[in-house]
Amino acid sequence: MATEVIATEGEAIYAWMIWILPFIAALIIPAVGKFSKISTGRIAVGFAAMSAISAAVLLPMALDGHEIHDQIDWISAIGLKAGVLADPLSIIMANVVGWISFLIMCYSTGYMKGDRDIVRFWFWMMFFIGSMQLIVLSDNLLQLFFGWEGVGLASYALISFWYRDKAKAHVGKEGRSALGIMEYYSPTHSGMKAFIMTKVGDVMMLAGMFMIFAFAGTFGFKELLADTTWAVNMSAESLLVPAAVLLFGGAIGKSAQFPLNEWLLEAMTGPTAVSALIHAATMVKAGVFLVARLGPLFFALGAAGILADQFFEIIAWVGAITALLLATQGMVNPEIKNCLLYTSD
C-alpha cells in the first residue's frame, strides 16, 4: 500500500515538471520555428529528455512504495484544486511514457528531416506527450479529462498530419476491399474517423464522471477512496455499475477496444513516428492506465462488493473479444506495418 509522504519542494516540482515541460516546449517551438526550423527539433528532444529525467528522479520513491500528492488552487469559487498524484503506478507509467517518447523524438529528427511542416510536427508531438503525462499524474478525474481531450486533439492532428492526401501517405492497397468496404484510406479521412470514434468514448466517460460527482461532490481519486458513502448511495439507486461502465467507455475509445476499435488501422496514415507514439507508447495505453487508476477504487467498495466482479468481468470480456478480432485481422493483413499494429492493442 502506497504511503503518502510530505514531499520536499524539489520532489513536488519534479512531479509537476514531468507534464509541464512538454507544454512549455509546445509553446516555444512555433516562435522559434519562424527563425530556425532545425532548432525546433533540438528543443523538442531536449524538453522530452528533461521530462523523462524528471520522471526518473522519482523512481526511488516509487520503489519504496511512497507517493507525492501536491495540490494548488484551481477554481477557488467552487473549491476545485489541481494536483499531481505521483504514486508507484503513475511514476512507473510516467517513466514508460517519458523515455519511450524521448526515443521516438530522437528517431523523428532523422525520419522527418526536410519535411515542409516540421514545426507543426514538433508542436503536436510535444503537446501529445504533455497531455499524456497530464493523464498519468492527475489527482482527479476532471484534470485527467483535460489531458484525455488533449491527447485526442493531438492524435487527430498527427494522424492527419499529411493532410494534402498524396497517394504515398494513404494506408492500405488501392482497390482492395473487405465485405464491400474499400480498405484504402487518406490521412484526412483517418484522422477524422479516429477523432469521432474516440469522442464516443469520451462522452461516455464524461457522463460517468459527472454521475459520480453528483453523488460524491468531488473528482479527487483520494477523496473518492477515503469516503465511499457516495458509492453506497449510487448502489442503492442502481447507478454505480452504469457509472463505472460509462467511465470504462472512455478507455474503450482511447485503447481501441471493441466496438470502438475500427479507427486503429487507419491511424497508420500518420508518420511512422506518430504511429509509434500512439500505438506503442502512449495513447492506446491511456485506457489501460485509466482502468488501473480506477481499479483500487472499485475493489475498495466493500458496501458494493458485487460491483467489482461485474465491472471487471465486463472489462475482461471486452478485452477478450478485441484480442480475438485483432488477432484474426492481423493474420490476413498483407502489410507488415498493419500486422504489427494489431499486436499493439
Language model regions located:
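Short phosphate-coordinating micro-motif centered on Lys-Gly-acidic
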Residues: 149
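Hydrophobic faces of stable alpha-helices that mediate helix-helix packing
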Residues: 21, 25, 99, 318-321
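Hydrophobic transmembrane alpha-helices and their helix-loop junctions in integral membrane proteins
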Residues: 103-120, 124-144, 153-344
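Transmembrane helix-loop-helix hairpins at membrane boundaries of multipass inner-membrane proteins
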Residues: 1-16, 27-123, 218-234, 293-295, ...
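Hydrophobic alpha-helical transmembrane segments of integral membrane proteins
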Residues: 18-19, 26-27, 255
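Hydrophobic alpha-helical membrane-embedded or membrane-associated segments
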Residues: 21-22, 26, 46, 206, ...
